[in-house]
């Protein structure tokens, strides 16, 4: 029986970047890995309502830099930056080194697999029909410019006695093409009937040129954001 490899893991170093960007010797590696896990768990627990897409952790010269990608930056920052300062202090306590927090806004949450899967799980927990939740997410993603999307739910759908799996796809989702920019995420909906698993694949187009192209795109987006901030001032 054919099994699917994790789409993000397969593309690491080709067109996908790591979520932890640091190098450590053998002595410190386990401690860094453990503190990364604790930081992520802490942030995901604190920022449940902030629609957090991903957390990037860097460790420059005995300090830690955390970049939070979120669809609701206002909730993360808080009134006059109070909330983000509390997060910074807590992260410094967990890791034992000075911490810095950067916040990056996710402009199109409909094209982010993590946010789409969480949206579907929250709808399922509110007893929205699973087919309606799936189709709504697929339509929103295609409207925002996705090349293709596939959504799969599995479990006791609609309270059925026997668990089953259903999926809905629109456009194309080429899982074998390494240059295909596929965003993938998984989440769980805890309903009265049990746990329902949700998987989302979003195909955003092909990236030619590998990691160098990704870095150029990131640099240009940072420059655009800086220019946008200057114009607002």
Curated annotation (Swiss-Prot):
Entry annotated with the keyword rRNA-binding: yes
One Pfam family here: Ribosomal_S3_C
Keyword list, A-Z: Ribonucleoprotein, Ribosomal protein, RNA-binding, rRNA-binding
A single BP term in Gene Ontology: translation
Job of this protein: Binds the lower part of the 30S subunit head. Binds mRNA in the 70S ribosome, positioning it for translation.
NCBIfam families documented for this protein: rpsC_bact
Family per record: Belongs to the universal ribosomal protein uS3 family.
Name of the protein in its database record: Small ribosomal subunit protein uS3
């Amino acid at each position: 029986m054919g099994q699917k490899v994790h789409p993000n893991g397969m593309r690491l170093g080709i067109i996908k970047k790591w979520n932890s960007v640091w190098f450590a010797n053998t002595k410190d590696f386990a401690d860094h890995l453990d503190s990364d896990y604790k930081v992520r768990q802490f942030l995901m627990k604190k920022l449940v309502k902030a629609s957090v897409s991903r957390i990037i952790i860097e460790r420059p010269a005995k300090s830690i830099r955390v970049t939070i990608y979120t669809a609701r930056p206002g909730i993360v920052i808080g009134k006059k930056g109070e909330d983000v300062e509390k997060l910074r202090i807590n992260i410094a306590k967990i890791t034992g080194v000075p911490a810095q927090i950067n916040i990056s806004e996710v402009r199109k949450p409909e094209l982010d697999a993590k946010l789409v899967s969480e949206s579907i799980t929250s709808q399922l927990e509110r007893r929205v029909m699973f087919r309606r939740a799936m189709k709504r997410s697929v339509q929103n993603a295609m409207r925002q410019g996705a090349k293709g999307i596939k959504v799969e739910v599995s479990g006791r759908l609609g309270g059925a006695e026997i668990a089953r799996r259903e999926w809905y796809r629109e456009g194309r989702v080429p899982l074998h093409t390494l240059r295909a920019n596929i965003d993938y995420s998984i989440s769980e909906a805890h309903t009265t009937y049990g746990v329902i698993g949700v998987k989302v694949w979003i195909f955003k187009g092909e990236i030619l040129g590998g990691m160098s192209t990704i870095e150029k795109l990131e640099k240009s987006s940072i420059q655009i954001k800086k220019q946008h901030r200057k114009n607002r001032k």
